[in-house]
């Protein structure tokens, strides 16, 4: 597959996403946003977009390190804060997380990672309530499709400007926006434990899976056609299973329909057609 297939006109993408943020935040009746700034590329891109769309004074970045967090993560997050001139707060999650960890075996990294992600979201939404600011998400399309994230943790937000951009496209947008190169080229990691990396967890690279997902979704190619492109059947089957199995993470809880008008099914909320005053 030609790598150019994933390339976008990032100037147009920037304009679309800035307009999206401005319009959606106004619809909710807010003027400012808060987001978790990890020192990674996804949150850096969202922070930059929000700053350009709303103004740096309307963006609050919350840095939430754990005692095992990489020093680079903190340094890179602070680098972006200084570059953009946005407001920022640091809130350690160590005490809260360690209280939970007392009952979780050290080898159960999945549960521990979920606890850390959900603890960060508790802090984020509390600051959101304190500041009367909307929580903006940072999960990219690759993560959402694969279910590589924590439900009601790092996947929780009111709006997400980058959820339709593959990880490789996030890199392209980051370069267009002038994100510091060390944030773009660093090994992708949720920083949940020392030495953890996304691609080691997944067992494949973002470049590999993005090309496969693009063929599956955007090109709507069937299995046989994709395998003809050189993709192994084992890889195809594994990724397809992940996409199907994690559909529940990409939607609100399913509601059993009883009445003639059911929230989320056939009732349109007021904010869908009028601005909240």
Curated annotation (Swiss-Prot):
Gene Ontology biological process terms, A to Z: NAD biosynthetic process
What molecular functions are annotated in GO for this chain?
ATP binding; glutaminase activity; metal ion binding; NAD+ synthase (glutamine-hydrolyzing) activity; NAD+ synthase activity
The catalytic activity, as recorded, is:
deamido-NAD(+) + NH4(+) + ATP = AMP + diphosphate + NAD(+) + H(+)
The residues that the entry says bind ATP are 36-43, 138, 167, 189
The first-level EC class reads ligase
Residue sites binding Mg(2+) per the record: 42, 143
Family (UniProt): Belongs to the NAD synthetase family.
> What is the annotated quaternary arrangement, including any partners?
Homodimer.
- Name of the protein this chain belongs to: NH(3)-dependent NAD(+) synthetase
Source lineage: Bacteria, Pseudomonadati, Chlorobiota, Chlorobiia, Chlorobiales
Record gene name: nadE
């Amino acid at each position: 597959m030609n790598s150019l297939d994933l390339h976008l006109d990032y100037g147009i993408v920037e304009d679309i996403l800035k307009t999206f943020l401005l319009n959606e935040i106004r619809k909710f009746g807010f003027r400012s946003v808060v987001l978790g700034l990890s020192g990674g590329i996804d949150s850096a891109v969202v922070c930059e977009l929000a700053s350009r769309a709303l103004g740096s004074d309307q963006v609050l970045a919350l840095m939430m390190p754990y005692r095992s967090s990489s020093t680079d993560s903190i340094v890179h997050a602070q680098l972006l804060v200084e570059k953009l001139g946005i407001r920022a707060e640091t809130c350690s999650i160590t005490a809260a997380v360690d209280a939970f960890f007392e009952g979780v075996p050290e080898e159960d990294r999945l549960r521990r990672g979920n606890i850390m992600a959900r603890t960060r979201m508790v802090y984020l939404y509390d600051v959101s309530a304190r500041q009367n600011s909307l929580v903006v998400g940072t999960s990219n399309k690759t993560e959402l499709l694969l279910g590589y994230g924590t439900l009601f943790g790092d996947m929780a937000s009111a709006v997400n400007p980058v959820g339709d951009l593959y990880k490789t496209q996030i890199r392209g947008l980051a370069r267009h926006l002038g994100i510091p190169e060390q944030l773009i080229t660093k090994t992708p990691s949720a920083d949940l434990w020392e030495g953890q990396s996304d691609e080691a967890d997944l067992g494949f690279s973002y470049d590999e899976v993005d090309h496969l997902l693009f063929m599956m979704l955007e090109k709507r190619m069937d299995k046989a056609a994709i395998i003809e492109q050189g993709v192994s059947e084992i890889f195809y089957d594994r990724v397809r299973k992940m996409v199907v199995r994690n559909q529940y993470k990409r939607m609100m809880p399913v509601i059993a329909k009883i009445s003639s008008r059911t929230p989320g099914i056939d009732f349109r909320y007021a904010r869908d057609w009028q601005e909240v005053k």
